[in-house]
């Protein structure tokens, strides 16, 4: 029997302040009530990210699917800071390791790309906390994530796939959709834009729901 870690508990543990200073902020600077909401918020977002990772929308390339598991991490980066976003990405992928079919390669790639996305967006938003800054940071983060996805897929993910599906067969899936004569070109034409669009969708949804969720995430009552 496979034992799966509890997403909320793991998120709670990683986001919990340790020692005299927490991972994300100093205890001296934040009141206890805020720290409580930080811990609970991280746990809830990590659990949501884990659940969303299992809700996939298939794409024309049958081994690539669209999911929205980066959305909770993006919300966490905006609410609690960029490091929180990375921690939520970490928890999500640690949980998914229990049912991994990619030899942990997929989770590693997902963590790298998701961390680049949320870290970039969170850092930009941290400098100027406006809706425009959040959207700009998210789009820039999605763009960088898309760029990083090229070497990640080419050198990490796809070499693992070749153990189960010949390189020629993988290329054939792409060739059924458009003219391409190499895996390198296929990843550039399909995977990179796909990754960017995936990030932009998360940014668009976050722009719509972050403000209504902000009182809960920040532990503040609506006025």
Q: What are these model-predicted stretches?
A:
Residues 11, 15-223:
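Loop-helix junctions at membrane interfaces
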Residues 2, 7-9:
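Ala/Thr-enriched low-complexity intrinsically disordered regions
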């Amino acid at each position: 029997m496979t034992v799966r870690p509890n997403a909320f508990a793991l998120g709670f543990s990683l986001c919990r302040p340790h020692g005299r200073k927490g991972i994300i902020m100093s205890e001296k600077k934040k009141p206890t009530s805020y720290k409580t909401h930080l811990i609970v918020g991280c746990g809830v977002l990590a659990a949501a990210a884990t659940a969303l990772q299992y809700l996939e929308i298939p794409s024309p390339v049958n081994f690539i699917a669209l999911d929205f598991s980066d959305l909770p991490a993006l919300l966490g980066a905006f609410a609690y800071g960029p490091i929180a976003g990375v921690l939520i990405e970490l928890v999500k992928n640690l949980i998914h390791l229990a049912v991994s079919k990619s030899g942990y390669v997929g989770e590693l790639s997902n963590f790298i790309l998701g961390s680049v996305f949320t870290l970039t967006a969170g850092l930009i938003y941290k400098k100027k906390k406006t809706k425009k800054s959040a959207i700009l940071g998210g789009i820039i983060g999605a763009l960088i994530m898309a760029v990083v996805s090229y070497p990640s897929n080419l050198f990490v993910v796809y070499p693992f796939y070749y153990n189960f599906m010949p390189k020629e067969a993988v290329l054939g899936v792409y060739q059924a959709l458009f003219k391409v004569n190499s895996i390198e070109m296929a990843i550039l034409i399909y995977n990179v834009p796909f990754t960017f669009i995936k990030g932009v969708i998360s940014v668009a949804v976050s722009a719509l729901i972050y403000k209504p969720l902000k009182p809960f995430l920040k532990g503040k009552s609506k006025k």
